Amino acid sequence: MEDFRMKQARPGNRIFLLGLVFIIWAWNSIGHSAELSSVIDQGLKTIDVQPASPQLLVVTNAPYLHQQDVSGLIYVRAIEKTAGATVGSGNLLFFWSDSSSPLLVMLFNKEHGKSVVIKQRGDDFHSETFDLSWEKVNQPQFWDEAGTYLLGRDLSVLVPLAQAWAKGVPYEYMKLAELHGDLCPGITAGYLMVKYLEKEYPLGNGEQYIIVATPSYCKDDAFQLLLGSTAGKKRLVASQLSEEQKKNITVPHPAGIVIVWNPSTRTGKGLALSFNFDDVREVVPTGKDSPKPIITMSLFKWFNQPERFVKVAAKFAVDNTVYKKIRETGVNPYELVGLTKK
């Protein structure tokens, strides 16, 4: 009588099954890519722009996605081929998102601000058309209504990126969205601090910026991406303070401590940074209670004048003992260097 017990699959069968799985995966990937290309092509017509036009910007989270064993890079290829946007041309921008997030692609015509945003929903792609002109998106009413759109808060990620590009701000600023996920007022404050340091305290031969990110908030991602002052290189340490500790700091609006350090001589200079968001709100045309994207966009014109918001509240010498101690867990860096109330 024939034995129906499970038997080990023959090598030929295994190869056939693996090949079948690959064919199904490839077919699905090609199908998704082709559908996206079709939606992009229609979107370009909607916003009245030709592929590879200097008026066209494409923003997407595609490189960071990995869904059902499909890399988001297949979508990047579809975008490049259909829209003609490329990294080298400066009109293809990315922003970080979780690998399981839905695909987002924004097509933006800077001539008049008309935009189509494509969002993946299951196996389908849905699109919405917006007027994202500078005048429109800098009105609080636009953001009051944003929750009624399919995209919701995604607009707060996409709009500042599009407007930064349209205004010609430095490419390095827009790259921050690839680490931070958006261009919020906090990461923009970090950008201003970086520009201030480079302008007022440029590094000498062999020197490094060491960041003591206390208190830590969005700003600190700018130090990591733009200065290379990362935690992995031991050039950034981050910590928070209790409310009681904050009250005792003598630095107004504390934004962390930067050490200009020379590892060869083991000496450096400490800079206690101050960043006042009240000063930021004063330059927002629509008022201090404006939505965050408007606050961010109001700062673009100040990128060459970081000193308007960034100050050095105190300077101090740093020797090797202080350098080691200030980076230890549990140490209040302000107390260590005498910047707290007696």
Predicted regions and their residues:
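Non-transmembrane, aqueous-exposed alpha-helical and coiled segments at domain scale
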Residues: I30-L183, L192-K342
